[in-house]
Amino acid sequence: MQINWLILDFKEINNFNLYQLLKLRSKVFVVEQNCVYQDLDDKDQKAKHIIGVFDNQVIACSRVLFEEGYYLIGRIIVEKKYRRKKIG
């Protein structure tokens, strides 16, 4: 299994991958984990995004923010069928 890892600023993410990334975040955080909160928090535009693409699909992602002298890693997710494969 060869995953293509992308590290991108928000403005560098193409529309196709952005849609898949947001869809995956909604699927995992809202549906699976029942975390009803505003995912779009205006921090994505300032973050670096680590995106794992396999078979032309976003299967993993996270974001890294630098705030007040610290790096914050968040929104870490892996598509359910790819978990427990040492991707995260």
Describe the residue ranges of each PLM region.
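Conserved beta-strand in the GNAT
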Residues: 51, 56-65, 70-77
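Conserved acetyl-CoA pyrophosphate-binding loop and the N-cap/start of the following alpha-helix
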Residues: 82-87
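Short strand-loop junctions, especially beta-strand C-caps/beta-turns
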Residues: 8-10, 76, 81
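Short amphipathic alpha-helix that is part of the acyltransferase structural core
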Residues: 1-48, 54
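Short, surface-exposed acidic/glycine-rich loop or hinge patches that mediate macromolecular interfaces
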Residues: 12-15, 67, 81
